[in-house]
């Protein structure tokens, strides 16, 4: 896999079991959905606890360029969004899947030409599915991948479309989020292998309903693999953003691999975020996991167990789980994640390559990874401009000397300041190593 090293970060080795409380910023997935819905709303909205990361800031910049008012209200995480007539503009997607897949439907309703581009790595990410679907709904689009151009005509007909969303749930979410503003709404039917990351579609549906939009799903009497959004107003909602649970997983993994304790406050008792699945995963690997009074606490075991798990619905957790598995006793099988080959990088090949370079024993399968315990050693860990690859390297570096993570700054995609948070976690832990560590 081609990769150019940008800089090296020496992942700090834990000198003792970690013992820390880690407060996480807002969810990227919820923040960017709230921004789209606020842009389409029938009045101004306020978003509190918004994530301010590269992905979120790219979404904000794009909306501003298209004519939406987005202003900070007192602090950077509180945003006031004022809808306005959509106009032509330029959209820099960076590496953000939510930007490149959620904004084209909005752009199709602009009055003017909207040009999309992004980072070089983004030009290989699959987009043809949603762009072809939009053409079928009446949009004028040139191109099937970045860069592409949407010629907005001020409105979009909408209607019924059949797609293969087995590559990404974002194809479905992207069409649903703007569909209430389409003249006919939209009916999206999926035809293909199972859609990955279904919790993200559940998140989209829940937020649409909170905005007063009528949504019919397979779970509410609709046809199988079919989602229907009726045309109508999007109600202005004041959004309070949950912490990003997927970004919490490296810190919780730190407790698991060092036999320590990490607590994360403001953990929701009920959520559509896929990151919530880390609770059951860590428990299956031997950790003690409790959620009480909004605080999730993970206490690591003496010995971490391997795991056999289907991660199809929670694929974004794969780098964290792979790092855990590489440090566990017993073989692990991570299944149902063939779609990760189309993420920021081919995450399956990247994880196998990087763990094996450190002495690991990882084999790619058709739909996942098999990870056999092996003695790991230090070395360079490439991030492939992928934020979750970088944090996976940091996890391994907690217990393996000399792991140097390249381009750790890519974590700013969803978690700015990750390196400082990681060091703060270690510095808040006891200085005296335990004998069992």
UniProtKB/Swiss-Prot annotation:
Residues that, per the record, bind phosphoenolpyruvate: 28, 97, 125, 170, 347, 388, 413
PROSITE patterns xrefs: EPSP_SYNTHASE_1 (PS00104), EPSP_SYNTHASE_2 (PS00885)
Entry EC number(s): 2.5.1.19
An example molecular function term from Gene Ontology annotations: 3-phosphoshikimate 1-carboxyvinyltransferase activity
GO BP terms: amino acid biosynthetic process; aromatic amino acid family biosynthetic process; chorismate biosynthetic process
Family annotation (Pfam families): EPSP_synthase
InterPro entries, A to Z: Enolpyruvate_Tfrase_dom (IPR001986), Enolpyruvate_Tfrase_sf (IPR036968), EPSP_synthase (IPR006264), EPSP_synthase_CS (IPR023193), RNA3'P_cycl/enolpyr_Trfase_a/b (IPR013792)
Record's catalysed reaction(s): 3-phosphoshikimate + phosphoenolpyruvate = 5-O-(1-carboxyvinyl)-3-phosphoshikimate + phosphate
Pathway(s) per entry: Metabolic intermediate biosynthesis; chorismate biosynthesis; chorismate from D-erythrose 4-phosphate and phosphoenolpyruvate: step 6/7
Residues annotated as catalytic: 316 (proton acceptor)
Keywords for the protein's UniProt record, in alphabetical order: Amino-acid biosynthesis, Aromatic amino acid biosynthesis, Cytoplasm, Transferase
Oligomeric and partner information: Monomer.
Protein's UniProt name: 3-phosphoshikimate 1-carboxyvinyltransferase
Organism: Rhodococcus erythropolis (strain PR4 / NBRC 100887)
This protein's encoding gene: aroA
